[in-house]
Amino acid sequence: MEPQPGGARSCRRGAPGGACELNTATESAAPMSLAIHSTTGTRYDLSVPHDETVEGLRKRLSQRLKVPKERLALLHKDTRLSSGKLQEFGVGDGSKLTLVPTVEAGLMSQASRPEQSVMQALESLTETQVSDFLSGRSPLTLALRVGDHMMFVQLQLAAQHAPLQHRHVLAAAAAAAAAARGDSSVATPVSSPCRPVSSAARVPPVSSSPSSPVSPSPVTAGSFRSHAASTTCPEQMDCSPPASSSSTSTPGSSPTPRSRKPGAVIESFVNHAPGVFSGTFSGTLHPNCQDSSGRPRRDIGTILQILNDLLSATRHYQGMPPSLTQLRCHAQCSPASPAPDLTPKTTSCEKLAATSSTSLLQGQSQIRMCKPPGDRLRQTENRATRCKVERLQLLLQQKRLRRKARRDARGPYHWTPSRKAGRSDSSSSGGGGGPSEATGLGLDFEDSVWKPEVNPDIQSEFVVA
């Protein structure tokens, strides 16, 4: 028997049935084409494996449409695909599915938690975006919603020349509520080297340049710059590319190999304006996020682990964010080759090849000169608080005046100036003893006539007439 065209179902007479079963398995391994029709008339063509599940199909559509998979519902012949494999619902090659968006109303739309928004943002990433980010080829930008505020996070990994070593660069901005409270530990997006356990090489510093007109990037190695956000306080995070290799070791690097606990440690933190922060961090990825060779796994779980390490590092960070003046001083005083016997903080303002005690004192004095007064930030916050208090006092005073005006308008016998003038004219033309007696008593018709100092013997006709 000759094989049929295509060879998909070829088997000889008398041959064991395994050959036909093998061809059948080959058929089942081929992808099947699905036509997805939306309620608005749009059509999408997808190729999925025969054993694809409903959850996998929704994830593919979520990545393609940039919509959370929880808000996608699929119908096949008026049957909703809830869970399980597509074959269980009779879906085959060339089947047509209807995409129905999920509409939420009432309080359910406000019940989404920040953790869900982070997972939705990460799940919407394609495999190419995840691979490019973890390899250091491109930054990762996430738009997250925290309550009524929008937060933009940009994270970038810069691969180093040393094996099993990479560097994270992150700049972040806090939410509006955190900026109003002055809480600098709520958003501690930072940038720093992240090295696996076996890394022993030194990490070069990172030099940053502005990459966004809204929020400048970090200025010096291990430092951040942030910019004030708008009234709605969107969070801007900028990343800086890796600089050329240098012999200066950043805080956290060690000349001898040693094991480090998984996690991140914030090295520096800079507050540029209310709601915008940046900084540097260093740490080691968790072994679950590394493959057998020690490289980060190409998975969104690795990105989520990095974000969790950053959030955990904020609780242990104890430091006052340096101001922009201090950063400019560090940039002007930074040496070309710092002395090896000084700490990283001292070498940032030391001159060229300073090894003697005199040069050490000069470097320390330059650091003190670069540091601005520590109460400058507090003075700015105090001025803002005073302005708010004065505005509240003004609003309260205006409210008291309006309340008094309404109370006077409801009082008895309120005389307007025009009515007083008309009464004086009528009194002068009427004659008799009434006007003269009223004038002699000195009544003021603008004030209330029921004051205690008024003579009680006055008859009613002089007051009311």
UniProtKB/Swiss-Prot annotation:
Family matches, as SMART domains: UBQ (SM00213)
Tissue: Expressed at high levels in brain and liver with significantly lower levels in muscle.
Annotated InterPro entries: Midnolin, Ubiquitin-like_dom, Ubiquitin-like_domsf
GO biological process: negative regulation of insulin secretion
Compositionally biased spans, kind Low complexity: 195-219, 240-257
Membrane-spanning residues: none
GO molecular function: kinase binding
Coarse class of the protein's main subcellular location: nucleus
Keywords in alphabetical order: Cytoplasm, Nucleus
GO cellular component labels: cytosol; nucleolus; nucleus
Region of interest (Required for nucleolar localization), residue spans: 397-424
Residue segments, region Disordered: 185-262, 400-445
Chain's role: Facilitates the ubiquitin-independent proteasomal degradation of stimulus-induced transcription factors such as FOSB, EGR1, NR4A1, and IRF4 to the proteasome for degradation. Promotes also the degradation of other substrates such as CBX4. Plays a role in inhibiting the activity of glucokinase GCK and both glucose-induced and basal insulin secretion.
Subunit description: Interacts with GCK; the interaction occurs preferentially at low glucose levels. Interacts with the proteasome.
Protein name: Midnolin
